[in-house]
Amino acid sequence: DLVVDTGTGNPGAVGIDWIANNLGALRRITVRSGDGQGVAGVDMTRAWPGPALLRDVQVEGFEAGIRVGNAEYGLTLEDITLRNQRTVGLSNTDNVLAIRHMTTEGVPLAIDNSGSGGHVILLDSQLNGSGAEAIRNEGHVFLRRVASSGFDALLLEHGTARPGTAVLDEYLTGTVQQPFDSPQ
């Protein structure tokens, strides 16, 4: 187990600036800012992160908890806890993220999926905070068993608030397409 503490008085700090390709993982890690300042807890905006795994990662404080950028190659996140970020818990720009068991606490925005190429799959997660929406989506999302509290809406998609603020059993951007008839 590893704890990375950026201390106090470091407004430009990044807890972990990380990139992995083909085989890499961050596991059992806590990243925290002593005074809540700093740019990001885990920053993966350098070209080109993934495939990689983040598992059992906690981030406390910072402007953003986890930042992901670039259109390649996809990341898997599981058992993620993001607390008290000033702007956003998880920011994704044009990458593909598969997330299971993510919890946010005290964030104004849980997930910002920006860029038309961004894809977020979010399963079995609890988004707690306070703000207009828990998830802001400008790309594509698939949500299953996602609950939220404290937000006005669970999802703002392409500028339109989607109904439902507490629990969403299943939702996806667009429509389901299948080549053959299938029993539902």
Spans of features found by a protein language model:
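Extracellular/periplasmic carbohydrate-active domains that bind, remodel
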Residues: D1-Q184
